[in-house]
A protein has these predicted regions:
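Alpha-helical solenoid scaffolds in eukaryotic macromolecular assemblies
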Residues: 1-260
Length: 260
């Protein structure tokens, strides 16, 4: 009803009347995004950029969803208002402090040639979201950013920090990217370490899914023995023998005894 009412006023070129209708509509129904979009579109078509900006500001005070914020940013970029867009991004990541929000902010800075600002976005995001469920996506984006900047050592440090920090069950893509990275930039030792890390990840997944899969525990132990870290070998043995099979399961006991 509000849309039709405003449309009638606009068709009859009663602009101030249409403005009044839109103003009443967004005041009464501030969560209906379509009303805001239509109101802003009218002002922009009339060349009233300052008025459109004021409407966006009113809308943002309601802390709307991601698309509304991105629409505001695109609006400012249409008029080449880079600093204004940057300021909106700062508010956006505070309102919606998600991995995707920060990655968009960093890519915006990168697109504008602001490498140090982009790096700062990633660093701030890691400080805030290193334990987030989507942290893998953040670390991969950060490492790939450093690769593009020809900073392979920075990228390697990010990958290694992430692999130590993120639970293995949430790091599959990270391992795959790290192995590919080492094949491109690493020496032989680095490549071997990455491959061992990937195999370690696979065994961790197998024993997590089935702790009584003693064949996987043996394979895992052999991997650590090939690496030669006594502490890791001991740790895997201790974890393996902690998984005592049910008393009646003879087939498990035969394999379990060999661990000792």
């Amino acid at each position: 009803m509000w849309l039709k009412y405003a449309d009638v006023e606009m068709k009859n070129k009663f602009i101030n009347h249409a403005r009044n209708v839109w103003d009443r509509a967004v005041t009464l129904l501030p969560r209906i995004d379509q009303l805001w979009y239509k109101y802003i579109h009218m002002e922009e078509m009339l060349g009233n950029v300052a008025g459109a900006r004021q409407i966006y500001e009113r809308w943002m005070s309601w802390e709307p969803d991601q698309q509304a914020w991105l629409s505001y940013i695109k609006f400012e970029l249409r008029y080449n208002e880079i600093e204004r867009a940057r300021g909106i991004f700062e508010r956006f990541v505070k309102c919606q402090p998600k991995v995707g929000s920060w990655i968009r902010f960093a890519k915006f800075e990168m697109k504008n040639g602001e490498i140090s600002r982009a790096r700062n976005c990633y660093e701030r995001a890691v400080d805030l979201l290193a334990d987030d469920e989507e942290a893998e996506q953040l670390f991969v984006a950060f490492a790939e950013f450093e690769e593009k900047c020809k900073e392979s050592e920075r990228a390697r440090c990010i990958y290694k920090f992430a692999l130590d920090h993120i639970p293995k069950g949430r790091a599959e893509d990270l391992y795959r990217k790290f192995v590919a990275f080492e094949k491109q930039y690493g020496d032989r030792e680095g490549i071997e370490d990455a491959i061992v890390g990937k195999r370690r990840f696979q065994y961790e997944e197998e024993v997590r899914k089935n702790p009584l899969n003693y064949d996987s525990w043996f394979d895992y132990i052999r991997l650590e023995e090939s690496v030669g870290s006594k502490a890791r070998i001991r740790e895997v043995y201790e974890r393996a023998i902690a998984n005592v099979p049910p008393a009646a399961e003879k087939r498990y006991w035969q394999r379990y005894i060999y661990l000792w």
